[in-house]
Amino acid sequence: MRPAELIRFKQSGRAITMLTAWDALSAALVEEAGADVVLVGDSLAMVVLGHATTLPVTLEHMLHHTQAVCRGMSKPLAQQPLVVCDLPFLSYQCGLDRAVAAAGTILKESDAAAIKLEGGEPEIVAVVDRLVRMGIPVMGHLGLTPQAVHRLGYRRQGIDPRSQDKLHRQAQALQDAGCFSLVVEHVPSELAGRLRRTLSIPVIGIGAGPDCDGQVSVTADLLGLTPSQPPFTPARMQGRELSINALKSWLKEQRDQRATPTTPPPPPAPDC
């Protein structure tokens, strides 16, 4: 899978599917399930590393997990999903050269084919333009942007006409700078639909309603593995409960076996 194929999917009306992975095991599951895109998201800071936000994750963390995800793929390269890696907080906001170095490190030292970054401010658009000129495919991300949690919180974005127009202008600027697709998170469905209709690149939603070119979800949320469930991602199974019960069953079995009295060995035969 290559980035250009997602644009062809949009043109043909085929829905785009994207799921997250963070290691070889989760990558193998997502690949076997048939996702078009595997996102190594900086959400692994919370899902895997136990942080409260995505901010503490480093470029080294993202590279480590992206390498593991790529090793988990088993299909021939042409049949593998597109692997996209999130650039972490402050790896691309502190200058163009640093952004190119960070993105280049991910693509050079893993088998990822693209990177994703958040925001649509002019400084971010300039980063996208530079990366694309350097041959690095970029996926954009607007709406609720977790790396801006201390400024925007985890609130729904684009809820009034002024902010909707701003997000639309930012989306157009990201497309003009060369983004091959755009994630929109936790925005009104009508805004996502407007973006889908006016942009030539795919609009992939999460908590943005059904009027998108595709959808992305955190795999751990879909499997019901996380302690708290986001409102826009209903679990498809109670994975946490099932896993805990399976572990409890094994632990009980081991303890019960140990507690069962064993038949003492027969006494040794007397010497003749």
Swiss-Prot record:
EC number, UniProt record: 2.1.2.11
Record key words, sorted: Cytoplasm, Magnesium, Metal-binding, Pantothenate biosynthesis, Transferase
Cysteine pairs bridged by disulfides in the record: none
InterPro entries assigned: Pantoate_hydroxy_MeTrfase, Pyrv/PenolPyrv_kinase-like_dom, Pyrv_kinase-like_dom_sf
Location of this chain's protein in the cell: Cytoplasm
Lineage top rank: taxon: Bacteria
Active site: E185
Pathway: Cofactor biosynthesis; (R)-pantothenate biosynthesis; (R)-pantoate from 3-methyl-2-oxobutanoate: step 1/2
Entry GO CC: cytoplasm
Gene3D superfamilies, per the entry: Phosphoenolpyruvate-binding domains (3.20.20.60)
Binding site for Mg(2+): D42, D86, E118
Residues covered by region (Disordered): 251-272
Entry note: cofactor: Binds 1 Mg(2+) ion per subunit.
Binding site for 3-methyl-2-oxobutanoate: D42, S43, D86, K116
Catalytic activity: 3-methyl-2-oxobutanoate + (6R)-5,10-methylene-5,6,7,8-tetrahydrofolate + H2O = 2-dehydropantoate + (6S)-5,6,7,8-tetrahydrofolate
Keyword Oxidoreductase in annotation: no
Gene Ontology molecular functions: 3-methyl-2-oxobutanoate hydroxymethyltransferase activity; magnesium ion binding
HAMAP family attached to this UniProt entry: PanB (MF_00156)
Family the entry assigns: Belongs to the PanB family.
Protein name: 3-methyl-2-oxobutanoate hydroxymethyltransferase
